[in-house]
């Protein structure tokens, strides 16, 4: 890692093994093979000059000793795994020809090339609308169970944390100030910062009493537009 990205007291461990100052060979064995990452905005991660299928195929060839045909077949299988529709056609699409949700699915497919133990998802749904957010979260939950991997989900959206996470860590100024079972932390937050975050959540609107007498009632209203002759 670049020296400016951490202090002398920094430590990053995975399975009890220190990653900071690890050799290049050790890092290469980790990246993609054991730990993969999905970023917030897929358009900044995908190469706009190459078809998405070729980009997945390249990842397969980089990490596996297989033929180009086998790599393409694996890329198509990965696209099916992340529930891309019409994979044969989408394989030959450029990033700008896909929707935001489809591009994020492509990024997830690339991250899963080597079936990693840990998938780091950094705000993976922030750039998506609410409906697509739910689809991507459902997909990630499904893949987590099918592949037996862990997901480190980084987000500022408390609603997503409550819905998606089993365990939660609350960070303030780069330090973990509270961690525990998601339900426990949300129901009984102990740290003042966690309490402030939860208190800042928008409260749902009150139910409207539809049984009260309406102030005004209009029926059988028609609108007509004169068309020029």
Model-derived features with residue positions:
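Conserved ABC transporter NBD signature motif
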Residues: 6-18
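Conserved ABC ATPase "signature" region
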Residues: 18, 70-89
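Conserved ABC ATPase signature
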Residues: 93-98, 102
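A short, proline-enriched helix->beta-strand linker immediately N-terminal to the Walker B motif
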Residues: 113-117
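Short, glycine/charged-rich "phosphate-handling" switch motifs in NTP-dependent
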Residues: 167, 179
């Amino acid at each position: 890692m670049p020296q400016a990205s951490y202090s002398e007291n920094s430590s990053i461990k995975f399975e009890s093994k220190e990653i900071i100052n690890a050799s290049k060979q050790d890092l290469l064995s980790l990246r993609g093979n054991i730990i993969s990452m999905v970023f917030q905005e897929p358009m900044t991660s995908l190469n706009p000059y190459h078809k998405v299928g070729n980009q997945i195929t390249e990842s397969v060839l980089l990490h596996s000793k297989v033929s180009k045909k086998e790599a393409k077949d694996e890329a198509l299988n990965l696209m099916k795994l992340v529930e891309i529709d019409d994979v044969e056609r989408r394989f030959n699409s450029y990033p700008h020809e896909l929707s935001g949700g489809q591009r994020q699915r492509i990024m997830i497919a690339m991250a899963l090339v080597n079936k990693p133990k840990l998938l780091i998802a950094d705000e993976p749904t922030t750039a998506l609308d609410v409906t697509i957010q739910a689809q991507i979260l459902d997909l990630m939950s499904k893949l987590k169970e099918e592949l037996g991997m862990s997901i480190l989900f980084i987000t500022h959206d408390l609603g997503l944390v409550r819905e998606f996470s089993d365990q939660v860590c609350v960070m303030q100024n780069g330090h973990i100030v509270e961690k525990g079972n998601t339900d426990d932390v949300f129901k009984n937050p102990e740290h003042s910062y966690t309490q402030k975050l939860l208190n800042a959540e928008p409260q749902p609107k009150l139910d409207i009493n539809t049984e009260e007498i309406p102030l005004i009632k209009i029926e059988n209203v028609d609108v007509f537009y004169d068309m020029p002759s």
